[in-house]
A protein has these predicted regions:
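C-terminal non-catalytic regions of proteins with extracellular/luminal or membrane-system context
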Residues: 1-166
Length: 166
């Protein structure tokens, strides 16, 4: 979350983004939308969901780190919200989120040190991927590049098959 806030604050500082109210929700080990998250989705214009999958089990139905992002995207879509999924680690999880209206691959999950707060000029090391993905999401940076791997489709049980999705 800190790296996302940093990226947004940097965009505001650079006059690439204005008039934004940011609300966040950190999910960990929960697979369903609670009332707090539901209210946040309902009151938002745009939904950005970050996913972090480090192994094939995280792509299967029943895995909290797959189910909650999917549920958030589904609920946002039901309310006609713009939804974006940011894949933070391995891009294979994109196949699990074909319900998102847009997908961004950050290809790096190392965020900022949370002890630095929301500063524009961090002094501790951090990964550039998450802040840069905020630039892509908000249109300040044009996405470029090609994934170095194919993203296969998923079977209903969350296992990968040989059909290339992306």
């Amino acid at each position: 979350i800190h790296s996302m806030k940093f990226g947004i604050n940097r965009l505001i500082h650079e006059n690439s983004l204005n008039n934004i109210k940011l609300d966040t929700y950190e999910y960990n080990n929960i697979g369903i939308i609670d009332d707090v998250l539901k209210e946040k989705i309902e009151s938002s214009d745009y939904i950005i969901v970050a996913s972090l999958s480090s192994n094939a089990n995280h792509l299967k139905p029943g895995a909290w780190n797959r189910d909650l992002p999917r549920s958030v995207i589904d609920y946002g879509n039901k309310l006609n919200k713009d939804t974006v999924l940011i894949s933070l680690r391995n891009p294979y999880d994109l196949a699990a989120y074909d319900n998102a209206k847009a997908q961004v691959v950050a290809y790096g999950f190392k965020g900022m040190d949370p002890t630095e707060g929301d500063t524009l000029f961090p002094t501790k090391s951090s990964g550039p991927n998450i802040p840069a993905s905020m630039g892509v999401v908000f249109g300040a940076v044009e996405p470029k590049g090609k994934l170095p791997v194919d993203i296969p489709s998923l079977n209903n049980d969350g296992t990968m098959n040989t059909e290339v999705n992306y």
